């Protein structure tokens, strides 16, 4: 099991909690409008990507890079940012792009922080529902509402 200092967990937890709120605001201010859909697969099959996928990933990468410039970033829409850091962020900017395309609100932004390849923190943000789940490895998972006043164990 990976053990980080409590202060490190707090730093990363605070960052992810703030990022969840920023992502929800970003969606409603910038992305809650008509969008383009294209197919990432050439030939047979269908793997949709929207301009919102790309915008979300750019936004997330910028937030991470500004706060943790030496960390690696692994994303779905762009090349991986490789560094010598033991920390890596894994991003799925829109998990459930097909749901996003048809207007189903169950799509989410998924972000994981890994230390030496092992997940230590995770975020599943649901902007339309104004809720997000936050988890620290081997700890309880929390559900936050847009007011952040009510926390529930999940």
Question: What residue spans do the PLM features occupy?
Answer:
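N-terminal subdomain of lithium-sensitive/metallo-dependent phosphomonoesterases centered on the IMPase/IPPase/PAP
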Residues: 1-94
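Ser/Thr-centric signal marking residues that sit
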Residues: 50, 97, 145
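Single, functionally critical "micro-switch" positions that shape active/binding sites
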Residues: 52, 125, 149
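Short, glycine/serine-rich, charged loops/turns that create anion-binding
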Residues: 78, 127-128, 153
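DPxDG-like acidic metal-binding loop motif
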Residues: 83-140
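Single conserved hydrophobic/aromatic residue that forms the stacking wall/gate
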Residues: 144-154
């Amino acid at each position: 099991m990976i053990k980080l200092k409590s202060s490190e967990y707090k730093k990363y937890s605070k960052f992810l909690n703030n990022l969840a709120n920023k992502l929800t605001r970003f969606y409603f201010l910038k992305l809650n409008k008509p969008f383009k859909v294209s197919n990432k697969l050439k030939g047979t099959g269908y793997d949709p990507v929207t301009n919102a996928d790309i915008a979300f990933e750019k936004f997330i990468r910028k937030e991470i890079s500004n706060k943790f410039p030496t960390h690696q970033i692994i994303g779905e829409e762009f090349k991986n940012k490789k560094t010598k850091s033991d920390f890596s962020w894994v991003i799925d900017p829109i998990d459930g792009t097909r749901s996003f395309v048809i207007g189903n609100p169950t799509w989410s932004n998924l972000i994981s922080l890994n230390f030496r390849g092992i997940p230590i923190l995770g975020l599943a943000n649901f902007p339309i529902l104004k809720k997000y789940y936050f988890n620290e490895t081997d700890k309880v998972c929390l559900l936050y509402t847009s007011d952040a006043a009510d926390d529930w164990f999940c």
